[in-house]
């Protein structure tokens, strides 16, 4: 019971102190507003400096991943393999799909593939003469369904290839640059050595970051269903691993896969790690913004000290009367520092709310096929900003508070 009574007394005393602090803030509202603005600018600058480093780096890496693959991506060339053996190719595809890492294969063909949009595939023989005149100038990429795991390929509409082994269908995906050519749900393709037309379903549009019209074909479906189009010259393996294995281990694993399936020669092309080249530039920019934010907060400290001392000159008589009627030195320090901390807490809440809604608002305005994923709020930087704001408030109010605590009650009689 005594503890409860003591707790209630402490609570009542805390509310009384808070009430005094709020009344104290009403004495000079303009001064407190200017102090809050200076703190607000410093906190926003600190959060912005972290955002530039994190979001800026994420944006650059995401854009580069559209062209060069997620970092790091290793490339290997395959030549001299038995690409025409259906059984061996099926085993090869099966092993590639079951790899624990992200592995995709692109194939270069001996013959050029031409593609044309059609309104319907029900009567190709009747429209074959006109179809050849509608062929569009596009790059054709034969690849596996895991290609969009290696490269950052957000979908503008539709879907990517189905990686299921069951019910393989002939489908293609076009990029945004080729979208104007393929305004229908169907397309046909053929090779130079044949007049037969092969129908495809246009299943999606992808943002691959290039201005060159490109069509992506499911290589596994072509190998299964269109043997006259499956005339492979060589292949390239793209390997992205997050497990930290070395290039030599990848080479050894791929070499074993080839030995067990289609055979051939394996050569290392190289490593795509272009995203890391931006680290130094972003680090310098982030450091500059951090220094700027700390300078702004330092100026805020000086401003608070100056305002606190000038306010102390105006409130000397009031504080002396408080001392004369029984206020302790600790009460005076609490009153002066409490005002600064109250402003700091309020500014922190406002700053974090504004910056949070700005970050979330930026994500809402991103297009569906944006290479950058949903933006994440930098919680760590917000915590650092709050701690820094409290420290700034304490430093800014400490000198005026200590000076106010040294006032002698006898001076109130003057």
Write out the residue ranges for each language-model feature:
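N-terminal Sec/SRP start-transfer signal
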Residues: 1-45, 414
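Membrane-proximal extracellular/periplasmic loop immediately following the first transmembrane helix
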Residues: 50-147, 253
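Structural beta->alpha junctions
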Residues: 78-83, 133-134, 205-209, 238-245
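Hydrophobic alpha-helical transmembrane segments of membrane transport and translocation systems
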Residues: 394-414
